[in-house]
From Swiss-Prot:
<dbReference type="GO" id="GO:0000287">
    <property type="term" value="F:magnesium ion binding"/>
</dbReference>
<keyword id="KW-0030">Aminoacyl-tRNA synthetase</keyword>
<feature type="binding site">
    <location>
        <position position="265"/>
    </location>
    <ligand>
        <name>Mg(2+)</name>
    </ligand>
</feature>
<keyword id="KW-0479">Metal-binding</keyword>
<dbReference type="InterPro" id="IPR004188">
    <property type="entry name" value="Phe-tRNA_ligase_II_N"/>
</dbReference>
<dbReference type="InterPro" id="IPR006195">
    <property type="entry name" value="aa-tRNA-synth_II"/>
</dbReference>
<dbReference type="GO" id="GO:0005524">
    <property type="term" value="F:ATP binding"/>
</dbReference>
<keyword id="KW-0648">Protein biosynthesis</keyword>
<keyword id="KW-0460">Magnesium</keyword>
<dbReference type="GO" id="GO:0004826">
    <property type="term" value="F:phenylalanine-tRNA ligase activity"/>
</dbReference>
<dbReference type="Pfam" id="PF02912">
    <property type="entry name" value="Phe_tRNA-synt_N"/>
</dbReference>
<dbReference type="InterPro" id="IPR002319">
    <property type="entry name" value="Phenylalanyl-tRNA_Synthase"/>
</dbReference>
<dbReference type="GO" id="GO:0005737">
    <property type="term" value="C:cytoplasm"/>
</dbReference>
<dbReference type="InterPro" id="IPR022911">
    <property type="entry name" value="Phe_tRNA_ligase_alpha1_bac"/>
</dbReference>
<dbReference type="Pfam" id="PF01409">
    <property type="entry name" value="tRNA-synt_2d"/>
</dbReference>
<keyword id="KW-0067">ATP-binding</keyword>
<dbReference type="GO" id="GO:0006432">
    <property type="term" value="P:phenylalanyl-tRNA aminoacylation"/>
</dbReference>
Length: 347
């Protein structure tokens, strides 16, 4: 065996092992690997030098020694690589970990608008009383908003100072933004003659008015109950039950006052005294006028019914002590943060 080459190999082994052990990063280790095991590395040069040895026995023995060294260095490099990778991971975990003791970023959660809350609550109360929720169009013809509801052409509600009329007619009919959801009652009675009819219609309505207690657009829910032998006592029970449930006060003071609406006879306005306040009007109601039944093809000698209309904004203002109706539509986040509700409040 060529003694000089053998001594050189043994000396190289000590040097390579030391460099592998002292490598402080994966980049340094890769340089060591290329230096010894790469295509232009020392081990490759040793194998090339074997070609110059003529003695086959010496060539074979030196080749085995070089192979052993190559395998040893390869194993040492793999082992060192695993160690360095583990150290790198630990370093990242220590320096990039989230400190859970720090205060979390404030989370902004949206809130349910008071009108959405009240609408949902009102419909739920009436649903428990057997009323079915129905919908209708916001843009209506005069027949469904006024004529069918026994509102004559000279009635003040039909004047342009109170009602929004559209410029263009549809099928030669004058169109309006509905002033109440009673138009949905008319459409329902036109479509079905299956009794009892027991519905509530909630939605946007429009009137030409704007101040602290009025807005051009607001929300109403109107109810209708039609069957044989419907009476005023049933109407009063329905109103009492609803108001007691909504305000959560079984001792709520409620009074009915005689009034006039063209679509009901007799008619009444309902006042409440809430939390010791003075009497406040909350809704209008009455027994459905026979002319309304005639206009939709229902025999008023056999069937009768009652109807009521409630302003959603009015209920919300009373229950949550909101003084200005216009604040519902100002889109102020600070206002909604104060008066809004968590989504879980919707039942």
């Amino acid at each position: 065996m060529n003694k000089e080459l053998l001594d050189d190999i043994l000396s190289l082994e000590d040097k390579a092992v030391s460099e592998i052990e002292n490598a402080s990063s994966l980049q340094d280790l890769e340089k060591v690997r290329l230096s010894y095991l790469g295509k232009k590395g020392v081990i490759k040069a040793y194998f090339d030098n074997l070609k110059e040895i003529e003695d086959a026995g010496k060539k074979r023995n030196l080749g085995e020694v070089i192979n052993v060294l190559r395998n040893k260095l390869d194993q040492l490099i793999m082992s060192k690589e695993n160690i360095l990778k583990a150290e790198e991971v630990n370093f990242k975990l220590q320096n990039e970990a989230v400190d859970i003791t720090l205060s979390a970023r404030p989370e902004k959660i949206g809130k349910v608008h008071p009108l959405s809350k009240v609408l949902n609550e009102v419909k739920l109360i009436f649903a428990h009383m057997g009323f079915k929720a129905v919908d209708g169009p916001d843009i209506e013809d005069e027949f469904h908003v006024f004529d069918a509801l026994n509102t004559p052409s000279h009635h003040p509600a039909r004047e342009e100072q109170d009602t929004f009329y559209l410029k263009n007619k549809i099928d030669d009919k004058r169109m309006v933004l509905r002033t109440h959801t009673s138009s949905v009652q008319i459409r329902t009675m036109e479509k079905t003659k299956k009794f009892p009819i027991k519905i509530v219609a909630a939605g946007r309505v429009y009137r030409n008015d704007f101040d602290a207690t009025h807005t051009p657009m607001f929300h109403q829910i109107e109810g209708l109950y039609v069957d044989e032998n419907v009476n005023m006592g049933q109407l009063k029970f329905t109103i009492h039950h609803f108001l007691n449930k909504f305000f959560g006060d079984k001792g709520l003071k409620i009074r009915f006052r005689n009034s006039f609406f063209p679509f009901t006879e007799p008619s009444a306005e309902v006042d409440i005294s809430y939390k010791g306040s003075k009497w406040i009007e909350v809704l209008g109601c009455g027994m459905t006028h026979p002319n309304v039944f005639q206009n939709v093809g229902i025999d008023h000698t056999k069937y009768n019914g009652f109807a009521f209309g409630i302003g959603i904004e009015r209920l919300a203002m009373l229950k949550y002590q909101i003084s200005d109706l216009r604040s519902f539509y100002d889109n102020k986040i600070s206002w909604l943060d104060h008066y809004g509700f968590h989504f879980s409040s919707l039942r």
